[in-house]
């Protein structure tokens, strides 16, 4: 007996596979209890930071991950699941989740960041890292400090009257 494949499920599989193509950062959220307005606001905030959010069927997501040879994420695919991908700075997207966790029923399940499985606690720590811009700014201030000190010293020397 041949098992017929539902064309809608094939379409969902292909759509989800395309959604994940070229993405190194994938996050899994439990959106249970969120209102439509809260989920829409979350989606909007994620899109503002060059990310994308999609509510998925867990079994189809498992098949897509298997097709992409990504393992270790099945435990995050239980219950209502929203998948978020990040195109640029993944920790900025993670910060958004934890802002929402404070005020809504959103739960962060885990993720896949640059080829490594992150559980909720690891993602929480990751979200607290400085952004790329903040890191560059900090680095520049570290480089600038000795030069500023030298300039102040030379200025003080020139102010001394002999």
From Swiss-Prot:
- Give UniProt keywords alphabetically: Ribonucleoprotein, Ribosomal protein, RNA-binding, rRNA-binding
* Subunit record text: Part of the ribosomal stalk of the 50S ribosomal subunit. The N-terminus interacts with L11 and the large rRNA to form the base of the stalk. The C-terminus forms an elongated spine to which L12 dimers bind in a sequential fashion forming a multimeric L10(L12)X complex.
User: Protein name, please?
Assistant: Large ribosomal subunit protein uL10
Q: For this entry, list what GO says about its biological process.
A: translation
HAMAP family the record matches? Ribosomal_uL10 (MF_00362)
User: Which gene carries the instructions for this protein?
Assistant: rplJ
The task this protein performs is described as: Forms part of the ribosomal stalk, playing a central role in the interaction of the ribosome with GTP-bound translation factors.
One cellular component (GO) term of this entry: large ribosomal subunit
Q: What family is this protein classified in?
A: Belongs to the universal ribosomal protein uL10 family.
- What species is given as this protein's source? Borrelia recurrentis (strain A1)
A molecular function annotated in GO for this UniProt entry is: large ribosomal subunit rRNA binding
Which Pfam families does the entry link to? Answer: Ribosomal_L10 (PF00466)
Tell me which domain of life the UniProt entry assigns to the organism this sequence originates from: Bacteria
Q: Does the keyword Zinc-finger apply?
A: no
